[in-house]
Regions:
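Conserved PLP-anchoring active-site segment centered on the Schiff-base-forming lysine
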Residues: 161
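C-terminal structural segment of proteins
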Residues: 1-158
């Protein structure tokens, strides 16, 4: 069971980062993966107003916001074409549409679960993540790091982070 004492919709990444430095506070996405834990959250930090819910295509690849849902990944025609349908296939078997409408890319990557089809897919694509304070890091390196209090903002495919 998860208990939340306070809720705060962050107005900036800096505000979200500052709030997240206090140990009992947590960043919220779709909350699917947090529900798997028995935790007490001091302040639940909502990133939904920060524009991290978009997928942008450039000549180099894609930038994917941490608040993009798995359903958005599944339905994005550009990502489907870029990966020859692999992204769509990697998420379409994850529980049901209702869960994919809630679960976020950020939560799926940040939690680094061994069972994560999303993490596996983006590792295969040599993706990178952008952390608010930590900058751009290869996903393979990030997946090996211990958890910290930084905020995962974006995921980049191949050269899109350059």
């Amino acid at each position: 069971m998860m208990t939340i004492r306070e809720y705060k919709r962050a107005e900036s990444l800096e505000e979200a980062w500052q709030l997240n430095q206090k140990r009992p506070n947590r960043v919220l996405g779709g909350m699917i993966w947090l529900k798997m834990e028995n935790i007490n959250v001091g302040t639940a930090i909502d990133l939904s107003g920060l524009g991290l819910d978009t997928i942008e295509e450039t000549d180099e690849g894609f930038s994917i916001g941490a608040m993009v849902t798995l359903r958005q990944l599944e339905l994005h025609p550009g990502l489907a074409a870029y990966t020859d349908g692999a992204v769509r296939e990697s998420v379409r078997h994850i529980v049901g549409v209702q869960l994919r409408n809630l679960a976020t890319v950020g939560g799926s990557i940040y939690s680094r679960f061994g069972f994560s089809d999303v993490l596996t897919m983006f590792l295969a694509l040599n993706a990178s993540v952008e952390l608010y304070k930590g900058g751009v890091v290869p996903l393979a390196e990030y997946a090996q790091r211990p958890y910290d209090r930084d905020i995962l903002c974006l995921l980049y495919t191949s050269d899109a982070a350059d």
